[in-house]
Amino acid sequence: MTMIQFNSYHQKVEIKRNLELMNLEHKKIREYVNFDVCSFEQLDEFQVGYSIDTDGNSLVTDEEDTWDANWIVIAYETMCGDPIIIDLSEEGYPISSLMHGMDSWSGGDFLADSMESFINFMKDIGDFLTEKQVLEGKRMILTKELDILLNEFLERNKFTDFEIWLSLLSPLFDIAEEYEQTMERKVKKMKEEGKKITEIAHMLNIKPKEVYEYIKKV
């Protein structure tokens, strides 16, 4: 049984359901994102060092820029370990990434306006990976495709920071960059061999417009 003081039984059930959905979607994309999500059963463990100490004593105070009693850690960034939280006092439980510095929790980035929106974005990422057959081992994705995916999410979450999501999705952007660099080398070699744009497009199974774009880069 969790030690977290939810505002109601309904809220507890809602958070539990959302975390189950979040873990379900995260499992599909875990290899391609820089964050991990806790289960409902792990919630108490994830609060240690933030709202409680190792003995379960509260670390919440009334001092400015300290930990808020309504903040619940549900995940963390895998690159630097920063906590990802929900705010129990806000409708939909908006999600943010916090950064601790100089004994203050005043810094951080907004990730999604609700748990539902966060879950839906993970679904979108999973659908994208399925469509592009990345989960089957193909690594043929473009940076502009990821930009479109991310910007569509940002349109629905107006206060979300692009840079923080760029960091959280860097494994995917790295795959795209590696693929594009490989294609640039192939296009350059074929062009030097005297092949026409239409020939290169046919041989690489891409559109002539894409070949032209690679030629402009090299």
Region spans (language model):
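A surface-exposed partner-binding patch
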Residues: 1-90, 192-193, 197-203, 207-209, ...
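Short, hydrophobic/amphipathic alpha-helical patches that form generic packing surfaces
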Residues: 76, 82, 116-124, 189
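Compact, glycine/acidic-enriched structural inserts
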Residues: 94-133
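Extended, acidic-biased charged interface segments
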Residues: 118-169
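Short, Lys/Arg-enriched anionic-surface-contact patches
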Residues: 163-183
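Short, amphipathic alpha-helical "recognition" segments used to contact nucleic acids or chromatin
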Residues: 178-195
